Regions:
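Hydrophobic, well-structured mid-protein blocks that either form specific transmembrane helices
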Residues: 108-153
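Sec/Tat signal peptide C-region and signal peptidase I cleavage site
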Residues: 15-19
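Acidic, serine/threonine-rich low-complexity disordered tracts
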Residues: 20-114, 157-249
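Sec-dependent N-terminal signal peptides
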Residues: 4-13
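Single-residue recognition of alpha-helix boundary sites
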Residues: 13-14, 46
């Protein structure tokens, strides 16, 4: 359950998967369910602000579980990212999370090296006082758990076919990890008696097992196939069991 914060962040990040290239001041809200039980809520607020005299975009993700599910899992997460509105590249990221007994503070400072590589200077503070620090570089852009929306905005929806894959890199827990979004085709989804024709995407995490390449399912995303391109539902996979997150209409 400690990955719940990451999953909540990713599902909200891709909720602007097919948004316009302009950065709007707005707030998106979702409710999460375990079966019929309301498990929590999350919101992603986007604001255009000034930072050190420069125009930037600030995104704040807040995720909370309800008391009804806290014996199963609990989270109280606040994540903030600052991005460059011109290319959606992250500048700074911080995370303060309470997930069960785990209390974590993380921050990442992004920069560009002299040879054009993306550099991510990462720090993670544990509740017992331990500190982990690491700097990693990549030829491709590295995102944090919220600024990955910038990656999602760049996807061309005009050339989709079933099985098409979109790969990106994510800074999390002082590591750079690979994530993949796979287009699955179309489906009709019903939310509060309203039907949506949706494009379906599967988010997976590649890993190695006994020398063989495998993929771990994280969530399935249902995006309305209309001009709004709204994510109306996410099916979240755990090691045991699953949950659903539905848009608040």
């Amino acid at each position: 359950m400690k990955r719940m914060g990451l999953i909540m962040a990713l599902m909200l990040a891709v909720s602007e998967l097919f948004a316009a290239q302009t950065w709007k001041n707005e707030t998106l809200r979702y409710t999460m369910y375990l079966g019929p039980i309301k498990a929590g809520e999350a919101s992603l607020a986007t604001k255009n602000i000034k930072r050190n005299g420069q125009d930037v975009v600030r995104m704040d993700l807040i995720a909370r579980t309800t008391s009804a599910v806290e014996k199963i899992f609990s989270l109280n997460d606040t994540l903030t990212t600052i991005v460059n509105p011109k290319d959606a590249a992250p500048v700074y990221f911080q995370k303060h999370c309470f997930e069960g007994d785990d209390i974590v503070k993380e921050r990442v400072t992004f920069s560009t090296t002299s040879d054009g590589r993306c550099s991510a200077s990462m720090r993670k503070d544990y509740k017992d006082g331990r500190v982990k620090e690491k700097t990693a570089t990549s030829k491709s852009q590295v995102y944090d758990m919220v600024s990955v929306v910038g990656f999602a905005r760049a996807i061309n929806t005009g050339n989709l076919y079933k099985g098409k894959r979109f790969s990106f890199k994510l800074a999390d827990a002082c590591e750079i990890i690979d994530e993949v979004l796979i287009y699955q085709g179309k489906e009709v989804v019903k939310i509060n008696s309203k039907k949506f024709s949706c494009m379906v995407f599967r988010l997976v995490e590649p890993y190695q097992e006994k020398g063989k390449a495998k993929e771990r399912d994280i969530l399935t995303i249902y995006v309305s196939d209309d001009a709004q391109r709204t994510i109306v539902q996410m099916d979240i996979k755990f090691k045991v069991g699953s949950a659903k997150a539905k848009i608040i209409l």
